[in-house]
Amino acid sequence: LVDGKLTRHIGVSNFSIEAIEKLNDGARIRPEMNQIEIHPYMQQDRLVDYCRDTGLLVTAYSPLGSRGNRVLKDPVVVAVAQKHDCTPAQAVLAWLMARDIVVIPKSVHEQRLRENFEATDVALDEDDMRRMASIERHERMSDGSFALFEDGPYTVYDLWGAE
């Protein structure tokens, strides 16, 4: 695809460290981006660090969580937002961007789209960053089961590995 000029960059999604290593061992052209679920309850520090160390950029999907937005109601997130006079969503997005993670929050509402963009104006300090890091739960909002077929050859472990 790159050689045929059909694309300039290659990215992967939901690749674990093991999957990235396996891909890179045989790849002539390495991917430049790994899109993974990241939010305050699923921070994936080990995978993010590995991606950085190997030159992969990281994109966070579901950066605000999902399923009723429990992440946005977390007392730590709310407190950080209040401290900066911003919304909880803006606080979470600012936290991710401060970690040099690309964010792709989903919204179809114009006001929320504006608010999400305005998160670029929120500057968190070291204490805020530590507080946000403290609420890690290793809790996926998307387990990937939607991509599996009942009689298919793959399991959720095949998708995520040991990560």
Regions found by a protein language model. Give the residues of each.
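Beta/alpha (TIM)-barrel catalytic core signal, keyed to glycine-rich beta->alpha loops juxtaposed to Asp/Glu
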Residues: 1-163
